[in-house]
Regions:
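Active-site nucleotide/adenylate-binding loops and adjacent lid/helix of ATP-dependent enzymes
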Residues: 4-21, 25-153, 160, 346
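Short, surface-exposed charged micro-motifs
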Residues: 155, 248-250, 340
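Short, His- and charge-rich active-site/binding loops that engage polyanionic ligands
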Residues: 84-110, 159-206
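C-terminal active-site "lid" helix and adjoining low-complexity regulatory extension at the edge
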Residues: 214-223, 251-317
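A long amphipathic alpha-helix within ATP-dependent nucleotide-binding catalytic cores
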Residues: 118-148, 176-252
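Pepsin/retropepsin-fold aspartyl endopeptidases
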Residues: 284-429
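A short, polar/proline- and glycine-enriched secondary-structure boundary/capping micro-motif
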Residues: 174-183, 269-273, 361-364, 411-415
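Short beta-strand micro-motifs enriched in acidic
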Residues: 157-159, 250-254, 406
Length: 429
């Protein structure tokens, strides 16, 4: 497992960040039905509800034989995947279905389970609950070879309207088609900038291949990635009393990303799946002024871009560069513009000359991540520098990062590359 002072532990999570979740927000997240009601009211996609059972009489009177071939029976206030029954398909006789593990379930079994839900057996706070039946999502073809049975989902951690980490959760035979890590599902880290899978963790162990297959964990690109991230932030926007939350999103074959549920107390295994501690990420975005969901996604992808430095070094060898190098900058019109840059490990963040940034179209409002957060000391005191999204190529390697904008007209080079963007390089003196 990763070891670092920046790893977020349960105590730090509870003390430092769960305080951003107010009572009303926790009440919404703890009720799947209330969450769905708010999502639908704000026109955010979520799987349809087929039936709601508030009393034993509702369960007895419900026409179970009219249910579709597959569906999901859930507790409204359940947690950790407990109490969820995933029905795969109808069996030969009426009133019988197969579960994900091939076992048979009858109408009588489902009624009894629904009564168990109402009694509070699976409730987060051990109180009475509501049972409901939800449509079962048809998964996209891209996932078919990565799951045993069941539908994978994507957990996005959102703090201050910025996605700070993401994880694909793959159901396994052990998890019986469910995507909960504590029941045996696989957690797979996702690069925030790309939506590409990176590292896998199963029952606390790192893995490189899907169990019972030779299929690699890394390298799978999640479709509609920016839309998924934006949807996660919008979920926080409609429940603003949840400042730090997990958003579970599923990809429907025909309708695209849909929100399954919100989690006011997200687990921390996502750090292991990404090989990246959370504490520093959360501190970097705390207090930023985020205009909207798209702005939050842009900041996340600039700050937390997956560099794959270790993999690149393993495959290509360490690249040696000079103190001054030619780079290509991705301009606002998507053209690549070549210029010279100074390589400076004494500076943390890269910077670009204001006039050059203006000519390249990088100072447009949608590319400015923040204006007043980053300051430098000048003859007239502390001066704010805007920070922009910045993509460039150095020694054939693409780097997606952030850069401060300053007046470099009296400098020899219009761009400075700081040590934050020099992982995997050796600098020739």
């Amino acid at each position: 497992m990763i070891t670092s002072v920046n790893v977020l532990g349960l105590n730090a999570r509870n003390h430092l960040f769960l305080s951003f979740n107010k009572k009303e927000g926790r009440r919404v997240a703890d009720s799947k039905l209330l969450t769905k009601r708010i999502l639908r009211r704000n026109h955010l996609p979520t799987p349809a509800i087929l039936a709601i059972f508030r009393s034993p009489q509702d369960i007895v009177n419900f026409p179970w034989e009219r249910l579709p071939d597959n569906f999901v029976l859930k507790p409204s206030k359940g947690f950790g995947g407990q109490g969820v029954v995933i029905v795969k398909k109808k069996a030969k006789w009426a009133g019988e279905w197969y579960l994900m593990d091939g076992s048979l379930v009858t109408t009588q079994d489902l009624r009894f389970h629904a009564l168990e839900i109402l009694s509070g057996r699976f409730s987060l706070h051990n109180g009475v609950d509501i049972a409901f039946i939800e449509e079962r999502i048809k998964i996209q073809k891209i996932f078919a070879k990565y799951v045993w049975h069941g539908a994978p989902d994507i957990r996005i951690l959102v703090f201050n309207k910025v996605p700070v980490a993401a994880m694909l959760r793959l159901p396994t035979r052990e998890s019986k088609g469910k995507s909960n890590l504590h029941q045996g599902a696989i957690g797979v880290g996702l690069g925030l900038a790309t939506g590409i899978t990176t590292h896998g963790v199963l029952n606390g162990r790192f893995i490189k291949f899907i169990p019972e297959t030779k299929r690699k964990i890394n390298g799978l690109k999640i479709p509609q990635w920016d839309k998924i991230l934006t949807l996660a932030v919008r979920a926080q926007e409609v429940v603003p009393s949840l400042g730090f939350l997990g958003v579970d999103i599923i990809l429907d074959k025909n309708r695209g990303p849909m929100i399954l549920e919100l989690n006011a107390r997200p687990g921390l295994e996502i750090q292991n799946a990404n090989w990246s501690p959370l504490k520093k990420r959360l501190e970097r975005v705390e207090g930023l002024e985020i205009k909207d969901a798209e702005h939050g996604v842009k900041i996340a992808q600039a700050l937390f871009a997956e560099r794959f430095a270790d993999r690149v070094m393993a495959e290509e060898g360490i690249k040696t560069i000079n103190a001054v190098e030619k780079i290509k900058i991705l301009a606002g019109d998507k053209n690549k513009i070549e210029t010279e840059a100074k390589i400076d490990t004494g500076a943390f963040r890269s910077s670009i000359d204001r006039d050059l940034a203006e000519r390249l179209g990088l100072l447009k409002e949608e590319n400015i991540l923040w204006k007043n957060r980053f300051e430098y000391r000048s003859a007239v005191g502390l001066q704010p520098r805007p920070v922009i999204g910045f993509t460039f190529w150095l020694a054939g390697r693409k780097i997606q990062t952030t850069a401060s904008v300053s007046n470099r007209s009296k400098m020899n080079y219009p761009v400075l590359i700081g040590r934050n963007d020099l992982m995997g390089f050796l600098i020739r003196p």
